[in-house]
Amino acid sequence: MNNLRQEFIKFSVETGVLRFGEFVTKAGRTSPYFFNAGLFNQGRTLAMLAEFYAQTLIDSGIEFDMLFGPAYKGITLASATAVALANKGRDVSFAFNRKEAKDHGEGGTMVGAKLQGRVVIIDDVISAGTSVRESVDMIRAAGATPCAVMIALDRMERSGADGALSAHSAVQEVSNTYGMPVVSIGNLSDLFEYLSNAGADSEQAKYKEAVAAYRQRYGVA
């Protein structure tokens, strides 16, 4: 058991970011759980989340020079992770993009440090991979090298519509397409382990079978 990963799942449940019930995903699937990183919306919880990002990135052993946060959620995540890394003795620069180009002041769509060297893309989740693709294009256009993607939760489920499911997840497809690792703080296996270790009388324990069935239907190895 990776204690950091289990601590993250527990933290997400306690803050209401990870909820159990019946939810419809972007892909139209009925999921027994829902993860909404936008609910890390207080200073304390954001600081704790950034600690998880920073420590997981350090533990991964990935060599990198700076962070990039795609608009919009990635902006806060990359900024906070840079602060957490600095608190751990690793001072790195960060940048992010605007959705709309600015025609005054510094102009353009990029904000923050100049993109250079090996860049880690920081985001919350990967659904269709659109945000990653756009980030990779921007980083390469600046002459830098995207070296990894860091996300909070990997749902570990196959892409595509029912009846035409891919053999791979969106995370695996991103990794295969761009030849770089996608590192997550937690994933579906960690979530299931959390439910398996929950007391029989706990509120979460009753969702174990639903999550198992969902993983059986949509999960990847």
Swiss-Prot record:
In terms of superkingdom, the source organism counts as Bacteria
Quote the catalytic activity from the record: orotidine 5'-phosphate + diphosphate = orotate + 5-phospho-alpha-D-ribose 1-diphosphate
Tell me the enzyme class: transferase
Name the needed cofactors.
Mg(2+)
Q: Which GO terms describe its molecular function?
A: magnesium ion binding; orotate phosphoribosyltransferase activity
Q: Which InterPro entries match?
A: OPRT (IPR023031), Or_phspho_trans_dom (IPR004467), PRibTrfase_dom (IPR000836), PRTase-like (IPR029057)
Q: Which SUPFAM superfamilies match?
A: PRTase-like
Per the record, what is one GO cellular component? cytoplasm
Its Gene Ontology biological processes? 'de novo' pyrimidine nucleobase biosynthetic process; 'de novo' UMP biosynthetic process; pyrimidine ribonucleoside biosynthetic process
Per the UniProt record, which EC number(s) apply here? Answer: 2.4.2.10
Pathway, per Swiss-Prot/TrEMBL? Pyrimidine metabolism; UMP biosynthesis via de novo pathway; UMP from orotate: step 1/2
Q: What name does the UniProt record give this protein?
A: Orotate phosphoribosyltransferase
State the organism of origin: Janthinobacterium sp. (strain Marseille) (Minibacterium massiliensis)
